[in-house]
A protein has these predicted regions:
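Recognizes extended acidic, P/S/T-rich segments that occur
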Residues: 357-398, 410-417
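Beta-propeller fold recognition
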Residues: 1-14, 122-172
Length: 421
């Protein structure tokens, strides 16, 4: 109690808030933040077929395992019971992991969607983006969210969609060679194809015309290119008064910034054609998606950056190319799955062939593999028979589970077999 009181008083001093301004009924809640007791935040509730689904965020926005859980009740005030399908929103792998502090809503076509925040957390602890994934209720009324390939483009039509439909286009750029006009030491072009939003290529100059190019190693059918800009220790003079509190100072920039670039493609590396020209736009999109439904043939994808906000050295965390390869899909992977002694962790050992990565799926019934972890092979291990291991701390003690491992590459997805854990 003494330690909690000290931390509480330190919080008041740091935030500049007199204790007299905190309503007495809220003091226990504020002090609760400094205990080891778990707490929930970001509550959201949906009603479906007479049941109430209380969703909440598990604290830890800076971690890849940031997630949303769900409780179910017959009344909006409870009593609530923990759903079997927890954590309901959980996307710990891939280019940009994290899926916590979210909301669930219907669109006008009857599709259910879940939005949550995704982690970057490099420049600041709460540096995040917002993701959106297909969700739904199964025949037993269980709420689910499909995040199997959660940061890949997916087709959305103006009608009822299948929330479990696999991606139409596959990732072509993972681990592929990259080159650039220049780069800062430790921020090489290769980082733009590493599938990790916490790393990025950075040009060593803020001069307009810096470029980044990805080599797919052979001409492929390209349907979409995702351009992900990053911030790198921005040092920008603040032109006005900084407001907020000591713990959350902020200045709202009302100036219209722009992000301008030209995207080109080439089959031979000598003759280039323009895919998208945004040299004159008035928009500032840090994450942009260029789609070509008809497809195009390209081996080289080149991004020339003309302008970014605050005249910074441009950074790209992912120049991600999606399409369909002309080779074979991966082999069905072999794997072993065991459970830790405390029943909270899933231990998976995988060996496959001709894969870029694997998707580990698990759930409490064989046909309800609602949870997933997307795993990429290291650049020098792609397509090899390298054995990989993954420890997943996301099981509910005492609950039965089933596991499946799928393999994927630029040519497609190969589903594995389901085994009991």
């Amino acid at each position: 109690e003494e330690q909690i009181e000290m931390m509480y008083q330190g919080f008041l001093k740091q935030s500049g808030v007199p204790e007299s301004q905190i309503p007495p009924q809220l003091v226990p809640m504020v002090k609760g933040m400094f205990t080891n007791k778990p707490f929930i935040e970001g509550p959201w509730m949906d009603k479906y077929n007479g049941k109430y689904y209380l969703q909440y965020a598990c604290p830890g926005a800076q971690f890849n395992v940031y997630a949303d859980g769900v409780y179910i009740a017959d009344s909006p005030l409870g009593p609530f019971s923990l759903a079997k399908n927890n954590p309901y929103s959980y996307s710990p792998g891939g280019f940009m992991p994290g899926a916590g502090h979210g909301s669930t809503m219907w669109d006008k076509h009857g599709n259910l969607w879940h939005t949550s925040t995704m982690r970057i957390s490099v420049n600041q602890q709460f540096e995040r983006r917002v993701g959106i994934w297909p969700a739904g209720f199964d025949k037993d009324g269980e709420l689910f969210c499909n995040q199997r390939y959660g940061d890949w483009p997916r087709v959305v039509s103006s009608e009822k969609n299948d929330p479990w439909e696999n991606p139409k286009w596959y990732l072509l750029s993972s681990g592929k060679p990259a080159s650039a006009s220049s780069f800062v030491e430790g921020k090489s072009p290769f980082l733009a194809t590493e599938e990790n939003a916490q790393n990025w290529w950075q040009a060593d100059s803020a001069e307009s015309g810096q470029w980044l190019e990805v080599d797919l190693e052979k001409a492929m059918d390209v349907y979409a290119i995702q351009i992900n800009f990053a911030d790198d220790k921005l040092d920008v003079p603040v032109p006005g008064e900084i407001k907020g509190t000591m713990t959350q100072p902020r200045y709202i920039d009302e100036y219209d910034r722009v992000t301008r670039w030209i995207l080109e493609g080439s089959v031979d590396g000598e003759n280039y054609f323009v895919i998208e020209d945004k040299s004159q736009v008035d928009t500032d999109l840090p994450h942009d998606l260029v789609v070509r439904e008809e497809g195009l043939q390209a081996r080289y994808i080149k991004l020339t950056i003309l302008e970014v906000p605050f005249e910074q050295k441009p950074c790209i965390s992912g120049l991600r190319v999606f399409g369909i390869g002309d080779g074979e899909k991966p082999e069905v992977p072999s794997f072993e799955a065991t459970r830790s002694d405390d029943e909270l962790d899933l231990l998976v050992n995988i060996q496959g062939e001709n894969a870029v990565g694997y998707n580990i799926l698990w759930g409490h019934e064989p046909e309800k593999l609602y949870h997933s972890w997307l795993v990429f092979l290291d650049r020098d291990k792609i397509y090899s028979k390298e054995r990989i291991e993954k420890r997943i701390g996301a099981l509910v003690k005492g609950q039965k589970y089933y596991v499946r491992v799928d393999a994927f590459n630029e040519n497609g997805i190969t589903e594995g077999v389901v085994i009991p854990l």
